[in-house]
Amino acid sequence: MSKETFQRNKPHINIGTIGHVDHGKTTLTAAITRALSAEGLANFCDYSSIDNTPEEKARGITINASHVEYETPNRHYAHVDCPGHADYVKNMITGAAQMDGAILVVSATDGAMPQTKEHILLARQVGVPYIVVFLNKIDMISQEDAELVDLVEMELSELLEEKGYKGCPIIRGSALKALEGDASYVEKIRELMQAVDDNIPTPEREVDKPFLMPIEDVFSISGRGTVVTGRIERGIVKVGDKVQIVGLRDTRETIVTGVEMFRKELPEGQAGENVGLLLRGIGKNDVERGMVICQPNSVKSHTQFKGAVYILQKEEGGRHKPFFTGYRPQFFFRTTDVTGVVTLPEGTEMVMPGDNVEFEVQLISPVALEEGMRFAIREGGRTIGAGTISKIIA
């Protein structure tokens, strides 16, 4: 049976729900799919199907995340929802789900809570550019308490502005009532999606830059060859393109003989899309997760760089003790983790949990690196820091 061709007639946006535990993120995600399914723009996903999230790995960190897709009349959305707070932190620091914008869900009965604040801060640190607020559980507020909602809104706006998110639209509604089909609340979901359409700009896709895709997984398809999957970070890849495989081992060249997305064949894949690429003459053992596929000579692998790093505090799940020059944690770049040896700058004897520092790293295997790229630092199964490459040395 020939595969159906994927229709690309709308711009594609990656978004996600963020916010405090039990404020209604997953219920809202389900309510969005329900409201849009009535217009034939989504398949309805109920709460339990979103809540029973499969485990996935990003930079070697196990994350539970649910991905749903839906459309508005103008756009195609991929939406990520995480069940647990720790999953959000890991998802955002690792950039596992790069978000073009986020829907911050806040319960009108509670207002901003600790994780609300933490998620806003995280969004800022990892570069989520836009936020739209959904003030949930508005059906629980009595007439007498109506003005409390205005106070919650003011507090939220201040909190967001403090972190550089000015003028975020705030939509009031009830995800649960919308999910139950209450027409006035379903209308609020439509209003929310209109606000998302209007306030989260279609990102400048990195389509014009040289093609690059970090490999997430490798499959062997009998009779066809080796398929590598991942999210295209930038550029365009077409069937017939010459590409390089960079990182971990010696750089190799190959030809892309097929591109597919959601099990449908495409003539090309573009930045932001999750695709599978069929590679000519490459065996399953020639490629592995953590390498990148790119336009020839656009990226090189490196082993030495300077990083601007934030080391998590003990309370954030980080280390309890300082570390010194010679420290050897794991460094996570895109889809790979490599041990690296840390050299602290002159005059810095040690780094304490909670410190911001710039230090040098010598990796034990070559990785495709670029300045401005993000990474996570892990040790003994937990994230102890996150950073950005400030300078490549070798």
From Swiss-Prot:
Swiss-Prot/TrEMBL catalytic activity: GTP + H2O = GDP + phosphate + H(+)
PROSITE patterns: G_TR_1, G_TR_2
Disulfide bonds: none
Any one GO cellular component localisation term in the record: cytosol
Subcellular location, record wording: Cytoplasm
InterPro entries the record matches: EF-Tu_GTP-bd, EF-Tu_GTPase, EFTu-like_2, EFTU_2, G_TR_CS, P-loop_NTPase, Small_GTP-bd, T_Tr_GTP-bd_dom
Entry superkingdom: Bacteria
Record flagged with keyword Zinc: no
EC top class named in words: hydrolase
Known EC number: 3.6.5.3
Sorted UniProt keywords: Cytoplasm, Elongation factor, GTP-binding, Hydrolase, Magnesium, Metal-binding, Nucleotide-binding, Protein biosynthesis
Chief place where the protein resides: cytoplasm
Pfam families referenced in this protein's UniProt entry, alphabetically: GTP_EFTU, GTP_EFTU_D2, GTP_EFTU_D3
Chain segments annotated as transmembrane: none
Region listing for G2, in residue ranges: 60-64
Residue ranges of every copy of the tr-type G domain listed in the record: 10-204
Binding positions (Mg(2+)): T26
Region (G1): 19-26
Binding annotation for GTP: 19-26, 81-85, 136-139
Matching SUPFAM superfamilies: EF-Tu/eEF-1alpha/eIF2-gamma C-terminal domain (SSF50465), P-loop containing nucleoside triphosphate hydrolases (SSF52540), Translation proteins (SSF50447)
Region of interest (G5), ranges: 174-176
Family: Belongs to the TRAFAC class translation factor GTPase superfamily. Classic translation factor GTPase family. EF-Tu/EF-1A subfamily.
NCBIfam families, alphabetized: EF-Tu, PRK00049.1, PRK12735.1, PRK12736.1, small_GTP
Job description of the protein: GTP hydrolase that promotes the GTP-dependent binding of aminoacyl-tRNA to the A-site of ribosomes during protein biosynthesis.
Protein's name in the database: Elongation factor Tu
Protein's organism: Chlamydia caviae (strain ATCC VR-813 / DSM 19441 / 03DC25 / GPIC)
Gene: tuf
